[in-house]
Amino acid sequence: MEQTNETVQDVQDVQVAGVNEANQVTQNVEPSLISLEKSIFATHSVGRVGILLIDASNSVTFNKINDKIVFDKMVEIVKNLPESEFRCIFWNSDNNRFIDSKSSKFKNGVQVFPSVFKKETINQIFTIVKSSIDEHCLTWPHLSFNAIPDSWINNTDPINIYFITDGEMGHRNIGVEEMMSLKMNLKNSIQKIFDKFNSIRLNIITLEPIVRDFTQMESLRSAAGCDVYNVIMENQMTRYITKFTSYTPDNTNGFVHISRNIPPPGYVPFGDKYFSEIHKNEFVKYILRLVKSTSNEDDLLKIVQNLSTTVSVLTKDKPPQTIRQTVKIFSDLFQKSTLDITLVNYLLEEAVEKETSGSANIFAAYKTKLKDLYKQADELLQTNVSKAIGVNETFLSVLVGNKIISGHARMIDQDTKINGKMWKNSCIDINGVRLPVLPFDTSNQSHMNEQCLRQWMRLLVTRLYNVNTMDDMAIYSVLMMMVRVVASDIDDNVKQAYRKLATIMLKKKRANSDTTELDRLEDGQLPIPNNGKIESFYSYMTKVSANLNLHVSSMTQWYIICLALNNDKLILRQLIHCKDHIEKDFPGIKPSELFDLVKKQIEPVNFVKIPVEYSLDYQCLVTLEDVSNKGGFKFLPHNSLTGDICRPIYVLSEEGQAGLIADPNTSICPICYAQLTHKDFEKVGPKVQQEELNVFTDSSEYKNLFGLNQSIQTITSSASPVISTFTTTANPSTQGFPGFDGRNVVLNKKGTLVIMKGTVGAGKSSISLLIKQEVENNGGHCFVEGTDKYCKTGLSTVEAIQEIKLSLSKINLITDDKPIVVVIDTCGERNNGDVAFDVKFTGWNKINVFVNHIRSEMNGYLAWTLRNVLRRTKPTDSDNHFLNPESAGLKVCMDVHRNKATALFGKKIPVLFSSTPNSINEAIEKLNEAADAYQAIIDQQKPLTDQVKLVIDKIF
């Protein structure tokens, strides 16, 4: 049955109801958490038989947990596991040299029992083994993994392996080299079994007779099993861990350090459960409800920990901007919780990165970071200034000279160096001028955001006004900026933003007190600095007055600041200290009229708003078409499931937008998962290029104070105090690049940028060389650059990029007017806007070339390209490729091919093999039929000469 507009409206009404949940709708319309869980989640079915790897070292026979011997406690734990039967391996150390001891029954350090034991009688085998344990039995965990017979596992039925231990690896007197050897053996043994089988779920269970607080990292330094987990984490193998649980006298039911799972394809994990991707919006509602019903800080951190796996799966192969926006969606769910959402965002973003790299943190790491971050706003700032200070969708630049800029946060992609430290994601670059950013909207700032913003502003005024970072003059310098902004004829929202910034600066706490400066001032106290000297305050106001071109008494200047802040309480309570001075400076004037009188003497500020078209991503998410030159449909702001406003920055092609909204069941926002209709889109024109902005028509007028490789000069504005000159040195490895701006090579020429797109083996290098030949035949310059030609010589990727930058920077040395073409010979799965290999191609004509690709024949395309890769040999000097099966092996080639294809064309690409091939030849044989058919199709429909001609015709 066709879905009508009324039906779509019904869906939206349901969403509104979900949003209203966050605003406390009456209880009788809210489904319970239990009912939500039942409707959203599924859990893994448990196999009948599990595998037990049981520590049989000497300590298990005498250490006790609450009067129960550890070995007996192990039996109790096993009987509570979900399987009904088990295969058992008891392990300790290689005791073959002790041929007369009881432990000699552990051949090569293990006892492997081929029989399957029922859970009800599992204690019997424990009793038998216990009699073989003696003082020679140590803890060598790798022996247990190496002893698992292949016949116990297959690749079709999921199976739990339970690694159960009571202590650290080795023994008390173990040396460094022996411990390193044990760790390497453990890493190799785990890697080996997971390389063979993909159906394993590894559970670590530890038992200790010691009381421990597992929320503190200090308690884990010598805790049982943590050294095993650390080996796994350090070797980026945490994706293999399903659960890590510890039992101690004070944790008799087990403390869960980490709980995760590997769901079936099309499903997303959350803790030990999983949900279908089509239920993403219901999942967001569930988390919102779960957070609302949770008040305990540790329980909230557990939710954050579980979400790290969820978000890493949801954002796999997504561009960085999408990852950041998705993290923000889930972070915002904690707005009304006891956790600071800035910290949640930081924790979650870092956790997703660690999860993706296979280095997932245990719970205590989250707890430790939560405590430490309050003391380390500086560290948070250095990690990502924009995020730390709470920039959301829109930024404001700091006032430099007489300019303030606003635009989309996507423009924030520059760093700066102040006081010898690098501050990442802190600036924008407009017409060659680098400007630090501030949040435009501070209405939802957390305490951490405000603290970071105060520290950031202190750093900026150090550079702008040559004041001591810790001096109160830093605060008054910000207040001076605010007065200039408020006195100008510009957007009221900008004035309000600077008022809030100034207020946040005044909310800093006094030394050795919980009272803020603002509290004192609103209480009517004099604005005396921390040093207790009113003379210091007078000195501050004299400087402010001179730089505002007012030249009034200190207390009159202070009242001008109070009026500019528009704080009624401050205006009322500070008047008593200022009115006599105002009367002396301006006889007969009403104090309330003072600001309007003096503002004409203050140098005005110009405000420039960067159009949204400059910041939008014009790579269509649906068709992958670049619509920069013709425009398309942008997403309109809409309510997310949490009640916040979602503003995706993507532009869809006309075909892509029509396809997305054609089916109401799949027309969801790629960021917040809200239902969308045609009303949620708006036509948008071509992308605005930076040179069209003309913000700084003469950039020499604004010295590049925040550039990385510039000598810092004084601002020539009459409204700015003198700034001392000092120099920061550029990175030595980049000083040789003509046009280097501190991060990127900036080209002073314009030309055509041709970007190859296609998975490995698509023939991109071949067509790139043909394009180069044709460009040069037509009298042009052509540069073909990619990392492969450098990496095949032994250079690292970083070194290869340096070579590419050096090569492309030579474009700036071209003196003739011949056409310039740059061909980027990569898979093209990343969209970095105008930047490729750290080279800026602003204003260049951009052509995307999907080489040898026919969309309707995706299965054939994938088969043909993979076969091309598998037929490769090690590259010679004349070869263009780098990836090959001789060097990398079959699995790596298949994985790289699949990952690149997924990044380019999405997750729903065809699967080439029903079962994994055992050899390169077997893989090629399975691919031949589809690959041969595709070769015939492209020979007929897309001959190379035609593909090259299409590109050349667009250039000349």
UniProtKB/Swiss-Prot annotation:
Which superkingdom, per the lineage? Viruses
Q: Which residues form a coiled coil?
A: 918-942
Organism source for this protein?
Acanthamoeba polyphaga mimivirus (APMV)
Write the protein's name. Uncharacterized protein L611
Give the record's keywords alphabetically: Coiled coil
Its taxonomic placement starts with: Viruses, Varidnaviria, Bamfordvirae, Nucleocytoviricota, Megaviricetes
